[in-house]
A protein has these predicted regions:
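Residues that form generic nucleotide/phosphate-binding pockets
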Residues: 3, 7, 11, 64, ...
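Active-site-proximal specificity loops/subdomain of glycosyltransferases
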Residues: 1-40
Length: 224
């Protein structure tokens, strides 16, 4: 983290504060700017979390979608920190600077949920606009939606992921389904990892397994 902090401070021109790993989430929208040397030659770059089971990503992020949009979120209501795609260009890599509060966010130790919506998830899920809600900082959701409104970028928001602990989830040959009906781009383990205790961690991850509200099963035997 010290190396990342030093790099970010040098590139941004002010001292950043990254005292604990979760603080890195605030910096996700700036990764294209901070790590530009790593993404040279690529048309797009992405951010993700480590508590993710991926499905068939390219089944959702198609060439047609990439051709039309500069930013892709896997929720309909806010920019998703757990997974998002950015076009590798100056406008997108520097878009985070459009926030009136990015210096405040990056220089203070507090985690602001800048990559998403400043913790306003519940209000947005209820259908409110981010611009109707009083927030502590101008989050990346604010920034992206403003840029879309001003015709600076094209962004795609769609509910493509699974979250929570609904059960009836099945991973099968690189795809992930709910109730054998709805396919998702990924399953975010944010809530599941809080309620289960692994028993046996397999050396090789099977090609098929099921996920209940509290366990992961393979051939009806708990594997994690």
């Amino acid at each position: 983290m010290n190396e990342i902090g030093d790099l970010a401070s040098k590139k941004l021109g002010f001292k950043v504060n990254i005292d604990f790993p979760y603080k890195l989430c605030d910096f996700k929208p700036a990764y294209g700017f901070l790590f530009s040397d790593y993404i040279k030659g690529y048309d797009f770059w992405g951010q993700s979390d480590i508590d993710i089971i991926y499905g068939n990503i390219r089944g959702f992020i198609t060439d047609e979608l990439l051709g039309k949009f500069d930013f892709i979120s896997v929720r309909h209501d806010y920019t998703t920190g757990c997974f998002a795609i950015y076009r590798n260009c100056y406008v997108m890599n520097s878009l985070f600077k459009k926030s009136a509060d990015f210096i405040k966010v990056f220089s203070e130790p507090k985690h602001y949920c800048f990559d998403e919506c400043n913790f306003m998830h519940d209000s947005l899920t209820e259908g409110k606009s981010i611009f109707e809600i009083e927030t502590e900082i101008e989050s990346f959701t604010h920034v992206v939606l403003k840029a879309v409104r001003e015709a600076e970028i094209n962004a795609h928001f769609d509910f493509l992921l699974m979250e929570g602990i609904p059960g009836k989830i099945k991973f099968e040959q690189g795809k992930i389904f709910y109730d054998n009906k709805l396919e998702a781009i990924l399953y975010h383990l944010y809530w599941l990892k809080r309620v289960y205790q692994p028993r046996n961690v397999p050396k090789v991850i099977p090609d098929e397994y099921k996920i209940s509200p509290s366990r992961i099963y393979f051939r009806n035997k708990q594997i994690a």
